[in-house]
Design a protein with these regions (language model features):
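Sec-dependent signal peptide cleavage junction
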Residues: 19-33
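Consensus positions within tandem repeat domains that build extended binding/scaffold surfaces
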Residues: 103-105, 125-128, 148-151, 170-173, ...
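Pro/Thr/Ser/Gly-rich low-complexity, intrinsically disordered linker/stalk tracts
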Residues: 340-368, 402, 420-435
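Extracellular low-complexity, O-glycosylation-prone stalks/linkers
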Residues: 368-387
Length: 435
């Protein structure tokens, strides 16, 4: 009888051990790793926390928000065993299909240091990552449209990457963090009051950003690059001493001018001046210039058989621009204007044989001429003629043949913008008999 009883008890114990092992086998199969805990995180969202501290959320739709009891986050609390799993979560992976992160969901998860956000998340809820002090950086994908109130306040964030698609950054979203730099992505609709903390001192407002509310960036002596020319900036949006860089005449420029004198500074964004040589050539094709300042040194283009007439605002006509002209607010092109080199035909020179084998040539001045050429020969056809250049209107020819008749012509030349000579027509020949 005792033997039967022992066998019966052994069988019961074996069955009980198998029953106890079922949950462990199930969780291993579900996660691929040993599982610490499985959580119901939304109506259709499940969270599995493995032994490495990685919490993987899968499912569809929104997650639950969390109730906070003092420092305890009840979403991650196992009241049956009195275990606060919030302190065991090191990494969060939010799968595709999940559309929002609930309010206060990860509050006080003080060991959390990595968050991967799925491609379907549209909203990051209020206070969702508050006091996640080990979370140093996060990349928020462009599918996220709204970062709600206080979402990352008092977290350890040092860097955040925001993408085009984000619409709203609500009050306190990044307040009391260690962020120092931030770029507000293109077409963001609204950056609310106190969205960022006093450590953020390098700010870029991208094109298409619509509204920056009062005290959105309270840091003093910050530097803001405003690429959105028409952004609405509310009074006191930035801390005292902040420099705003933007297009001259833009909303940023007006904002600084409307504020108390000296409270902010404005730095005009340099514009680009393009030089169009207009059938000529120019070594300098563009330069950077500051609106409201002088153009300063301008390049000098060149063109064969033309002189440079200056830079103008239009290809034909327009206003002339010189070194001391003031630069406008927008990128623009200046066009070279040209004057064709025209040299008048020289008049017949006066030629006299003043001594043996010599002749003096007197040239009637041609307006604007840089110099002259004298051509002389013993044949009327000028075959075998010699040519002499001069910048004077009187020149003596030497080494001529005595008793010979010479034909003498002159022509003027000017120099074009390349420095080369452009000649006029030869004059009528003057004859002279040499002594």
């Amino acid at each position: 009888m005792k033997q039967v009883w022992k066998r019966l008890m052994a069988g019961v114990l074996a069955v009980m051990m198998m029953i106890c092992m079922v949950p462990e086998l199930t969780t291993k199969a579900a996660s691929g790793l040993d599982t610490q805990m499985v959580f119901q995180c939304g109506a259709n969202v499940t969270g599995i926390l493995d032994i490495t501290g990685t919490l993987t959320l899968t499912g569809t739709g929104s997650t639950f928000g969390a109730d906070i009891w003092y420092s305890r986050n009840n979403l991650w609390y196992d009241d049956e065993n009195d275990i606060e799993y919030q302190y065991r979560i090191n990494r969060v992976v939010i799968g595709d299909g999940i559309t929002s992160i609930g309010d206060s969901m990860f509050v006080n998860c003080t060991k959390l240091n990595s968050v991967t956000i799925g491609k379907d998340i549209k909203t990051i809820g209020k206070w969702s990552f508050r006091n996640c002090v080990m979370l140093k950086s996060i990349d928020i994908p462009g599918t996220v449209e709204k970062i709600d109130k206080g979402a990352f306040t008092e977290s350890g964030l040092r860097t955040v990457t925001l993408h085009t698609g984000l619409q709203y950054i609500m009050s306190g979203a990044f307040e009391d963090t260690a962020l120092t730099n931030v770029t507000i992505p293109e077409n963001t609709v609204n950056v609310e009051t106190a969205a960022f903390g006093e450590s953020v001192k390098n700010i870029t407002i991208s094109k298409g950003v619509a509204v920056i509310q009062s005290y959105a960036f309270p840091a003093e002596n910050a530097y803001v690059d405003v690429l959105a020319d028409d952004v609405v900036i509310s009074a006191w949006a930035f801390g005292e001493g902040t420099t705003l860089k933007g297009k001259a005449g833009s909303a940023a420029d007006r904002f600084v001018k409307d504020a108390d004198e000296g409270y902010y500074r404005f730095e005009a964004r340099p514009i680009t001046v393009v030089f169009n040589a207009n059938k000529g050539s120019c070594q300098v094709q563009k330069k950077s210039a500051t609106p409201g300042e002088y153009y300063g040194t301008l390049p000098v283009p060149v063109r064969k058989k033309y002189t440079f007439a200056g830079w103008y605002t239009s290809k034909t006509g327009g206003a002339k621009v010189m070194n001391l002209s003031k630069v406008g607010n927008d990128n623009h092109t200046l066009y070279a204007h040209w004057k064709k080199v025209s040299v008048a035909k020289a008049k017949k020179p006066t030629v006299k044989s003043t001594a043996k084998k010599k002749a003096k040539v007197t040239i009637k001045k041609v307006s604007g001429a840089a110099g002259y050429q004298i051509r002389y020969a013993t044949k009327k056809s000028m075959k075998g003629a010699k040519v002499k250049a001069t910048t004077k209107t009187s020149e003596t020819l030497t080494g001529l043949k005595s008793k010979k008749k010479y034909y003498v012509q002159v022509r003027a030349f000017k120099k074009d913008s390349t420095g080369k000579r452009v000649y006029g027509s030869w004059s009528t020949a003057k004859t002279v008999k040499i002594r």
